[in-house]
Regions:
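Amphipathic alpha-helical interaction surfaces in cytosolic regulatory modules
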Residues: 1-82
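Cys/His-clustered metal-coordination modules, chiefly Zn-binding fingers
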Residues: 67-144
Length: 144
């Protein structure tokens, strides 16, 4: 199931709960642009209502979703985070770019350090554009 756009008071999260006969739910969250406070409340409620016997996986988890996980302990429900989008910024050419990272032991073990990437436009090293410790520690805590 692909979730895109803004998660807010106009969002219909009912497809997350239309799981008759399913034992797995895979969410592609790369298209989530932002989430407001009403969206956070509704998202947490939707995650809570997914039966515990359904395996839930988040793929390509967008930056706004990862940021919410850093602040709200139960934001993910009983989901497993398989991959995240990581924000980077190039000081040389002013490019913002997100790289896909698979969640594995290297990413979720202290010290939390963002891998280095070169800018796809100018080839210079890019800077991770969030607080590494918070960003990666929140993901690490999911399956701990």
């Amino acid at each position: 199931l692909t979730v895109t756009g803004c998660i807010d008071e106009r969002s219909d999260l009912s497809p997350l709960l239309s799981l008759s006969g399913a034992n797995t739910l895979v969410l592609d969250l790369a298209g989530v642009e932002r989430i407001n406070s009403v969206g956070v409340r509704d998202w947490i409620e939707a995650m809570r209502r997914i039966p515990a016997d359904i395996a839930v996986y988040w793929d390509r988890t967008a930056v706004p979703m990862v940021c919410q996980m850093t602040m709200i302990a139960n934001f993910h429900g009983h989901s497993h985070i398989r991959s995240i989008m990581a924000p980077y910024y190039c000081n040389t050419c002013d490019l913002e770019h997100q790289f896909l990272m698979t969640v594995d032991k290297a990413l979720t073990s202290p010290p939390y350090e963002a891998p280095s990437f070169d800018c796809p436009d100018c080839g210079k090293p890019m800077n991770f554009d969030e607080m590494e410790e918070d960003y990666f520690a929140s993901v690490a805590a999911i399956d701990a």
